[in-house]
Regions:
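Short, polar/proline-rich extracytoplasmic segments that appear immediately after membrane translocation
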Residues: 2-70, 77, 162-183
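Beta-strand-rich interaction surfaces with strong enrichment in secreted/lumenal proteins
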Residues: 74-77, 132-138
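A surface/secretory-pathway sequence property marking extracellular, secreted
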Residues: 40-67, 105-133
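C-terminal, structured domain-capping segment
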Residues: 29, 79-108, 138-183
């Protein structure tokens, strides 16, 4: 431990050069017109402008744009793991000719980057996290906001911390040329309903979700389970989500199924001992069910700290699990505070149900359908006073319960990011 503390004092000095190259040669060839005619003074003007440093960044040499407006220079020194520096800068096409990305280059100490040191975070992307790629269009009289992030990783072991001061030269270069038929618009977030899962996941990871609203829906093909609808059930992360032991099931970007996907038992054993953690349904959802999701979506699903209520058997305690897929509890649906569920104080109501006015006295909005017919559906908490039951939601939306070995509706949720 003593060695680790000493190593924390070593510096990372980052010197970064951000370059925008202009494809003049391509343009001069294309505009080499012989004979009579008129060219209405087309202009080619792509450059950097509008540097903005993110709040929370460490002190650094303020990024500056050179007089040609094609290079951004800055340097930063990190002394403690967890420090970072981030800024945005606009790539502006102020001309009358559409441009597109031709070449993207990222170098560390003069060598194209394939891997980074274990202690270093570094990425240049569009502001929403989408990678900058060849053929991306930059239309005339438009701009794209680039984001530069560099940091000293926080969650690293003492062996990953450099044993001496490090000076790292990072350079990013993008070359724009006149656009042609290969030009495509970058896949920025536009609509939860129509965006690809990769675009959605990337947007959530970069906290760029303003175009996605609670209640927005998107259809998903579940193979043999048919086509179903997902909705955004939550976007907020209030202070209570950071409380030790607080379930993360209603914190962050949560998606839930609008309808009931299938009818299944919770467990083939007539007991709720062990709670959610011991159920066959949990195992199924986090294996077979998970594998039915599209790969781009599956890869973006986060591990979720999940708290479930316990039953009346002696020695029972809260069920604590780490899940990809989970069931809700009734607090998350109707802000329930009753005695049937012992985990109420460890979670919160989802944004969707809160904004829809769903409560225990107004539960209709919690009802769900299975193949078009109203049906009750399972929740994850064991019934607090009946040792063979788990909680559920009645077809009317009110709280209910069922024997662990009887079939009920399954309408799970998960988080992405």
């Amino acid at each position: 431990m003593r060695n680790k503390k000493r190593q924390l004092n070593y510096l990372l000095v980052i010197i970064l050069l951000l370059v925008i190259s202009i494809g003049y040669a391509v343009l001069s060839t294309n505009l080499n017109i012989v004979g009579s005619g008129t060219i209405n003074n087309p202009t080619w003007n792509i450059h950097w402008e509008n540097v903005q440093v993110k709040t929370g960044s460490v002190s650094a040499t303020t990024p500056t744009i050179d007089t040609a407006k094609t290079t951004v220079n800055y340097s930063v020194t990190f002394t403690i793991p967890g420090e970072y520096f981030e800024f945005t800068v606009d790539a502006v096409n102020a001309g009358t000719i559409d441009g597109m990305v031709s070449v993207v280059s990222n170098k560390l100490n003069g060598t194209e980057i394939t891997t980074l040191p274990n202690y270093l975070e570094y990425k240049v992307s569009y502001e929403d996290g989408i990678d900058i790629a060849p053929n991306h269009l930059l239309a005339a009289n438009s701009s794209e906001k680039y984001k530069v992030h560099v940091g000293y990783k926080k969650d690293i072991s003492s062996t990953d911390i450099p044993s001496s001061p490090q000076t790292l030269n990072l350079s990013f270069s993008v070359t724009y040329v006149q656009s042609d038929s290969n030009a495509v618009k970058p896949s920025h977030p536009e609509s939860f309903e129509t965006d690809s899962w990769q675009t959605i996941v990337t947007a959530v990871q970069n906290n760029y979700t303003s175009v996605y609203n609670v209640g927005d829906t998107k259809t998903i093909d579940m193979g043999t389970l048919g086509t179903h609808t997902l909705r955004i059930a939550n976007k907020s992360t209030p202070a209570e989500c950071f409380t030790t032991g607080f379930s993360q099931t209603a914190c962050g970007f949560v998606l839930e199924f609008v309808d009931i996907i299938e009818s299944k038992i919770v467990s083939s054993v007539a007991t709720n001992i062990g709670g959610w953690s011991a159920t066959e349904l949990r195992t199924y959802l986090n294996s077979t069910f998970l594998d039915r999701l599209p790969l781009e979506l599956k890869n973006g699903i986060k591990d979720t700290y999940t708290v479930g209520g316990y039953g009346p058997a002696e020695g029972e305690t809260l069920s604590i699990t780490i899940d990809k897929i989970y069931l809700l509890n009734y607090k998350e649906v109707a802000n329930y505070t009753g005695s049937i569920d012992t985990s109420n104080s460890y979670t919160r109501q989802l944004d969707f149900y809160s904004s829809s006015g769903v409560t225990t006295s107004n539960p209709e909005g919690a009802g769900k359908k299975y193949n078009g017919t109203d049906m009750w559906w399972w929740l994850r908490s064991a019934h607090a006073t009946k040792n063979v039951m788990f909680t559920g939601v009645a077809s009317s939306g009110g709280i209910s319960s069922g024997y662990s070995y009887t079939a009920g509706g399954v309408s799970p949720a998960f988080r992405i990011g």
